[in-house]
């Protein structure tokens, strides 16, 4: 049987030009966390700011400036189409990994509390490891698209991206920054699993990584002290267990609804890093269990929204966007879980910030970039869905 030739060419489908709405629940959740974070940083830092800078709003003002820079960087990231990230993700990751080397060079990197993680650039302190986490997601997403068959069917396809990721992780460990390393590796492993990698390499790699982490803890007095103090902070509440015991006291004082915004006591020289890593403890004291549940719900929603965008992208045959969205969802979920877990004493102290909230310009910038990329992906998916629906509804598309 021969196919019948069409009597006349089908008319071209006209392009639909319209503005597609943003994912407002995602946007409002992120903006709400940013605003809430600024309020709580202000509350948590007033005592220490008054003591060190003779201005109770010193850290609040700096945090507000960082918020402005982060939002501008987010707008810039939103204007970048996803295919640009796909094409340049590997180069962004390599460039940020090279900057990690600069951090470790004496005279370039800045050391705070025994950790060398920053490069001073005028009034800003750039923390490359924060950007490496995001660029690692972009790199691995692009790799999974380009080498999908190898990742699924060949061990070499599974190992190749881990060589670069492992090199960056080693540089971050040398700072030292154990928490960022763990979150980045866990996020990448989750993305490889979503990419279809077989289970056996995961088991072998997890065993190797687990043995390596145990070795690092055993042979590092600094890390060993943190683990021991985490297991029983009340054994030495005025030395190795001081930070965690003070955090738990803050949660205990907060009870159900807290002592009131600004009325917390633990932030007044009792709880170290109250406006950075241990900000949730201040929230727990001043807003109680109710405030903490709202905070947890916001992070759960943000992570779920990112994952759902990834599922939609996969259904529309947009694999890069799918991997990026799900990678960002994994990263936000993991980092917020680790930070909150450290504050309530179910995980050892890691030195990780709470995304979108803790004091620190680099974390805010990377968080805003990540949300902007998610919003851009969502708008692109809405356009694809709208055009597909339009084509299905035209008479010539059904001919």
Curated annotation (Swiss-Prot):
It catalyses: [GlcNAc-(1->4)-Mur2Ac(oyl-L-Ala-gamma-D-Glu-L-Lys-D-Ala-D-Ala)](n)-di-trans,octa-cis-undecaprenyl diphosphate + beta-D-GlcNAc-(1->4)-Mur2Ac(oyl-L-Ala-gamma-D-Glu-L-Lys-D-Ala-D-Ala)-di-trans,octa-cis-undecaprenyl diphosphate = [GlcNAc-(1->4)-Mur2Ac(oyl-L-Ala-gamma-D-Glu-L-Lys-D-Ala-D-Ala)](n+1)-di-trans,octa-cis-undecaprenyl diphosphate + di-trans,octa-cis-undecaprenyl diphosphate + H(+). Pfam families: FTSW_RODA_SPOVE (PF01098). Residues 1-25, 86-88, 139-153, 303-326, 375-399 are cytoplasmic. Residues 47-64, 110-117, 175-177, 220-281, 348-353 are periplasmic. GO terms for cellular component: cell division site; plasma membrane. InterPro entries: FtsW (IPR013437), FtsW/RodA (IPR001182). The keyword Glycosyltransferase applies. Pathway: Cell wall biogenesis; peptidoglycan biosynthesis. Keywords: Cell cycle, Cell division, Cell inner membrane, Cell membrane, Cell shape, Cell wall biogenesis/degradation, Glycosyltransferase, Membrane, Peptidoglycan synthesis, Transferase, Transmembrane, Transmembrane helix. Belongs to the SEDS family. FtsW subfamily. Peptidoglycan polymerase that is essential for cell division. This is Probable peptidoglycan glycosyltransferase FtsW. It comes from Allochromatium vinosum (strain ATCC 17899 / DSM 180 / NBRC 103801 / NCIMB 10441 / D) (Chromatium vinosum).
């Amino acid at each position: 049987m021969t196919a019948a030739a069409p009597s006349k060419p089908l008319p071209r489908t006209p392009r639909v030009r319209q503005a597609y709405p943003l994912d407002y629940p995602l946007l409002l959740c992120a903006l709400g966390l940013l605003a809430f974070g600024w309020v709580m940083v202000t509350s948590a830092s007033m005592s220490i700011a008054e003591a060190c800078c003779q201005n109770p709003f010193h850290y609040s003002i700096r945090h507000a400036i960082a918020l402005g820079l982060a939002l501008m960087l987010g707008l810039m990231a939103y204007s970048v189409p996803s295919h640009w990230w796909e094409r340049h993700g590997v180069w962004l990751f390599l460039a940020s990994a090279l900057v990690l080397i600069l951090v470790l060079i004496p005279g370039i990197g800045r050391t705070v509390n025994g950790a060398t993680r920053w490069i001073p650039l005028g009034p800003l302190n750039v923390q490359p490891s924060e950007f490496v986490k995001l660029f690692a997601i972009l790199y691995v997403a692009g790799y999974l698209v380009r080498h999908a068959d190898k990742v699924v069917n060949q061990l070499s396809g599974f190992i190749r991206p881990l060589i670069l990721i492992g090199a960056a992780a080693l540089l971050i460990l040398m700072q030292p920054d154990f928490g960022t390393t763990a979150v980045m590796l866990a996020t990448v492993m989750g993305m490889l699993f979503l990419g279809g990698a077989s289970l056996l390499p995961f088991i072998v790699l997890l065993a190797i990584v687990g043995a390596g982490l145990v070795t690092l803890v055993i042979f590092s007095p600094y890390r060993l002290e943190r683990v021991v103090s985490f297991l029983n902070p009340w054994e030495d509440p005025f030395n190795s267990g001081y930070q965690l015991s003070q955090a738990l006291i803050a949660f205990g004082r907060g009870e159900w609804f807290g002592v009131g915004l600004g009325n917390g006591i633990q932030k007044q020289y009792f709880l170290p890093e109250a406006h950075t890593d241990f900000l949730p403890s201040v929230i727990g004291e001043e807003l109680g269990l109710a405030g903490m549940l709202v905070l947890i719900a916001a992070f759960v929603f943000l992570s779920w929204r990112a994952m759902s965008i990834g599922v939609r992208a996969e259904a529309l045959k947009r694999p890069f966007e799918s991997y990026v969205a799900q990678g960002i969802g994994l990263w936000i979920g993991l980092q917020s879980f680790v930070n909150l877990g450290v504050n309530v004493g179910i995980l050892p102290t890691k030195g990780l910030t709470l995304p979108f909230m803790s004091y620190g310009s680099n974390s805010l910038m990377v968080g805003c970039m990540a949300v902007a990329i998610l919003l851009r992906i969502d708008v692109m998916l809405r356009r694809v869905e709208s055009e597909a629906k339009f084509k299905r509804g035209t008479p010539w598309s059904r001919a």
